Every structure is written in C-alpha cells, then in structure tokens.
Amino acid sequence: MRAGRALSNIAEQYRFHASIGGARLQRWLYLSIYYASWLVLRWGDRHTRALAVLRCLGMSDRRALLNLPDGLLLELDLYTSYDALYPIYEGRIYAPEPGFEPKSGWVVFDLGAQQGIFTCKAAKAVGTQGRVVAFEPHPSNFRLLKENVDRNELRNVTTVEAAVADRIGEADLYLHLHSTGYSLARKSTLGVVRVSLTTLDKTAEELGLQRVDLIKLDIEGSAIPALRGGERLLRRLKPKLAMEFESDRERRELPDWLRGLGYNVRVTAGYLYAD
C-alpha cells in the first residue's frame, strides 16, 4: 500500500513537470537523482539525505526559468521547483479547504514568500482590484521574488524584505539543508544571515489596509510570534489563516489561542486552517 502510494506520488511529480515549459531536462534529472537517492538511502531521514546528495552535486541552487500553465513565468532554483511548485499549483497545500483559495478583490498576506510561487499565483487570482503583500527575509530569495513579480508585471504585489515577528528590529536567520527552508526558530550549523523584523500590525497600519482576507504562513517554526505580532489585525479584520505546523509547540498552542480570538480552527494532515 505504502509502496503503491509512493509510486503514485512519483508519477504525479513527473506528470506535473511534463506540463511545464523550460529547463525540462534539468528538472527531470533533479527528480530522478532525488528519487533514486531516496530509494537507495534506507536509513535515517531519507528525504534530507537525498537532498544532501543533490546539494553535493551542486544541483539544488541551479536556476531554471519556467513557463507555467497559467501563463506565469517564474525563475526558481531546482530545489524550489521540486519541493514547493507542485503542491502549491496542484492545490495540495494552503488552499485545499473550501473558501481558502484567493479570490478576486482579496487582500492576501504571504509570510515566507520565498521565490514567489504562491505570491504570483495569488496575485493573478485576486486581480487588479486585489492586493498581495509578500514577506521574505532572505536576500537571495527576496531578489528572485522581486524579479518574478516584475517579470510578470504584477503591479498589485507589495514586497517586504523582512521576517514577520512580534517585534520590530533584527534577528539571525539560520540556513538549512532544505535550500529555501530558512528559520528564525531553528538553529543550524550551515550559516546565519542577519535580517530585519517587522510585524503584521505595523505593516497593515503603514499600508492603510482596511481589509485582509487571507494570511498564508510558511515561516519554519515562527508562526507563534508572527501571529502574536498581528493580534490587533486578527481581532479587527479576521483574515483567514492557512499554515503548515512546523513544531510541536505550534500544534499545542496555536489552535486554542486562535479560538480565543473567535476563530473556527481546523487541523488536517499537519496543516491549520482558521476562519
């Protein structure tokens, strides 16, 4: 059963990447090496070990310009094109719950925008009457985010080079093996970058926003301080929330805290949806 599911997932990845134009050979080679490594390395965290093989081969950070079925043109590193593109575009994360898919006229906050996949997809969905505010603290990711927004002429996107927290200032951003999985919360030995911090409340005030319809969070274990730094916004505007749990603390604390703010919270397959 498990082997059948794994083979089905592999086939779906190849099918999806076959539907995308640009650097197809590079992407298929990346996928093939990843899955071959995953099958051979049968001890420890096989996912992380397979990624380590690709990093040692110098493939994870190679960039590819991709032509997506909806007309977006995105430049992504190969790791991001494998790890994030498929689940976001196939609706596997952030929008599988009814009512959480960005709609025309919505204002969307993208926390942990990385290289802009969700940001650009949401910007097309909300249209010229809507707006997307994208937060990304890591300098190289932010440059790609900006380039992708500009390349697609998405004038309804505001980019913010900062991590979202419960205070204004600076903090160390720790680098991890997962090419774009940088974290304020989880220390590592791979490196550190000093980044700016902002809050949801400050951003909403500075932009003069009277509505925020959806907040998507992918910030590697930092959701608690990020949401606490936006408590006024959450109480006043009640945006929908979609996030993946990244720590046991988030699983323990966030559902009850959000219910205390009047949210209806649903937890499914490691994801939290609140409205």
Question: Each predicted region: which residue ranges?
Answer:
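Conserved acidic-Pro-Pro-aromatic motif
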Residues: 106-107, 202-275
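Hydrophobic pocket-lining residues within nucleotide cofactor-binding pockets
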Residues: 113, 164-166, 200, 219, ...
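S-adenosyl-L-methionine
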Residues: 1-138, 143-144, 207, 271-275
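Hydrophobic packing residues within well-ordered alpha-helices of enzyme cores
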Residues: 122, 145, 173, 226-230, ...
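Residues in the short beta-alpha loop(s) of Rossmann-like NAD(P)-binding domains
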Residues: 138, 148, 165, 247
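Glycine-rich adenosyl-binding loop in Rossmann-like folds that engage adenosine-containing cofactors
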Residues: 72-100, 155, 160-209
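Short alpha-helix adjacent to the SAM-binding motif of class I
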Residues: 140-151, 253
